[in-house]
């Protein structure tokens, strides 16, 4: 038995709609479509633009206004041209301008002069990256829609192609918690919550953040270590977890990048699953990274991977808007009431945790070796009383006052010891010693010298006698590596040469004028990271 449908209500009188705006060119009138105040894209734009303003005014972002405009205007011009070609109408390029603004917010070009907001340095790099990001929306498509978030795929490709010496992502850590940072957190969080709630994507964002926090907690607890430009010491443990999980850059990623309505599943269950999987994939990609550049690119790459496999995910989750597409019902179906399901869930969780720990092996214990056991068995061969008093640059004192109040003496003693330990590594043909005192370029250089010695080559030692030392702050060029102390030293270098049998075959002596770069390791150790020519003058 069926019920007859109710009688149709009388039709409401037609409401006259205003005629669309037009622009007449060459005698032809073309429709003009401007944005609506209700358009969520305008709300996202207001948040991103506000962050740009805060970055210029109070947060010291290393990006200039011309660079930002180059990215936004390039995308806008391309989008207007493409849509006009398709529809013979002028459409406000809201999405395109978001793509350009997002690229400019996250990308930094190495060499951009700080504190010069109107610098035109490398503006064309922003234009090219933003333009290619936008074009990806029209080139890489599946079932009538773009596959990747345009700014996300463009940034990942740019960082991988250009490399850390030319381009780098915005730092995880922006500034100390001051009024500017509080304003940035307020704008990003409030705007993000309102927009994602309106788009019904809050569940996706929450699923990502909770899963990401848990997965990153496993990685941090395993002893993961990351070097970063804004920290002298390696970022490990709770500091590593806290900085990244609460990073405003991660909040921008979860509120305004992974929640792109066009690139996420349309169903409720699918969206939550998508957020969980982006968090897991991003953490697995971040795990082996030892510096901030690789960590940030890995985070962004997690979304690229999941967008690429989204068609497969769509097949595994309930049909959107079907009776099964209910998150509570789906969770009940996956309930752990039976021992078999509970055991399977436990195995999955253990496998994921083990995978994260295993993937993080390259960033654990190898970057900064535990040196106490190794160095405790070797002669230091350094008399601190023979070292000169150290003059300290104001940049060092401003960054770490403890170094200006006596801590620099210990740094210089450690440098002198490390240089002698390098000699011991060559004499003893022991690479473990190098891991305890060197890192980065210096480690690679000394390992190459050690390989030559182990192959039967002569042993060349260098003993340094310091006459003067000046400490300054070395800002890494490009790669988001840690700050280093530059010890500009002058004095006399005595060189010794030994043959494969251990007999000394020669000795030289002469002045040196070099800058020794050192970086703080875990604990109170400092590592040699480079030897540079002294600055001119």
Regions found by a protein language model. Give the residues of each.
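Core segments of small alpha/beta cavity-forming domains
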Residues: 387-465
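Juxtamembrane and targeting peptides
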Residues: 341-413, 417, 421
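N-terminal signal-anchor module of multipass membrane proteins
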Residues: 2-85, 423
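Exposed beta-sheet edge and beta->alpha loop/turn motif
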Residues: 362-373, 475-537
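C-terminal ends of transmembrane helices
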Residues: 27-31, 55, 76-88, 132-146, ...
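Loop-to-transmembrane alpha-helix initiation sites
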Residues: 123, 176-182, 203-205, 241-247, ...
């Amino acid at each position: 038995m069926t019920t007859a449908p109710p009688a149709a209500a009388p039709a409401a009188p037609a409401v006259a709609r205003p005629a669309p705006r037009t622009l007449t060119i060459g005698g032809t009138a073309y429709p003009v479509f401007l944005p609506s105040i209700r358009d969520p894209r305008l709300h996202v734009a207001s948040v991103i633009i506000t962050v740009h303003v805060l970055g210029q005014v109070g947060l010291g972002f290393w990006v200039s206004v011309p660079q930002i405009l180059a990215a936004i205007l390039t995308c806008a011009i391309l989008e207007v041209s493409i849509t006009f070609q398709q529809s013979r109408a002028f459409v406000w390029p809201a999405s395109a301008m978001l793509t350009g603004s997002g690229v400019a917010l996250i990308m930094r070009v190495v060499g951009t002069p700080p504190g010069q907001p109107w610098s035109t340095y490398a503006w064309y790099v922003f234009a090219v990256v933003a333009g290619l990001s936008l074009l990806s929306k029209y080139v890489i498509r599946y079932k009538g829609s773009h596959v990747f978030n345009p700014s996300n795929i463009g940034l990942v490709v740019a960082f991988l192609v250009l490399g850390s010496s030319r381009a780098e992502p915005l730092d995880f850590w922006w500034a100390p918690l001051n009024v500017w940072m509080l304003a940035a957190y307020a704008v990003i969080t409030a705007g993000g919550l309102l927009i994602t709630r309106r788009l019904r994507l809050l569940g996706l964002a929450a699923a990502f953040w909770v899963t990401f926090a848990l997965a990153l907690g496993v990685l941090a607890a395993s002893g993961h270590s990351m070097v970063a430009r804004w920290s002298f010491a390696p970022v490990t443990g709770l500091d590593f977890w806290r900085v990244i999980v609460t990073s405003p850059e991660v909040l921008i990623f979860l509120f305004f990048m992974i929640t792109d309505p066009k690139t996420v599943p349309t169903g409720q269950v699918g969206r939550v699953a998508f957020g969980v999987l982006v968090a897991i994939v991003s953490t697995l990609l971040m795990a082996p990274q030892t510096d901030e550049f690789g960590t940030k690119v890995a985070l962004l790459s997690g979304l690229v991977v999941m967008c690429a496999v989204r068609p497969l995910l769509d097949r595994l989750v309930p049909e959107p808007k079907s009776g099964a597409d209910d998150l509570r019902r789906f969770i009940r179906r996956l309930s752990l009431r039976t021992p078999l399901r509970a055991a399977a869930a436990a195995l999955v969780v253990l496998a994921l945790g083990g995978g994260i720990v295993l993937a993080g092996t390259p960033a654990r214990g190898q970057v900064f070796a535990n040196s106490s056991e190794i160095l405790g068995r070797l002669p230091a061969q350094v008399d601190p009383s023979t070292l000169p008093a150290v003059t300290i640059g104001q940049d060092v004192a401003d960054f770490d006052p403890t170094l200006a109040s006596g801590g620099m003496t210990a740094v210089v003693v450690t440098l002198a010891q490390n240089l002698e330990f390098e000699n011991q590594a060559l004499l003893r043909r022991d690479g473990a010693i190098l891991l305890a005192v060197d890192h980065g370029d210096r480690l690679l250089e000394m390992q190459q010298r050690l390989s030559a010695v182990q192959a039967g080559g002569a042993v060349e030692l260098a003993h340094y006698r310091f006459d003067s030392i000046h400490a300054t702050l070395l800002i890494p060029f490009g790669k988001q590596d840690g700050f280093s102390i530059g010890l500009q030293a002058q004095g006399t270098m005595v060189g010794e040469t030994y043959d494969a049998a251990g007999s000394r075959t020669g000795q030289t002596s002469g002045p040196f004028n070099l800058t020794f770069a050192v970086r703080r390791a875990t604990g109170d150790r400092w590592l040699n990271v480079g030897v540079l020519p002294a600055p001119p003058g």
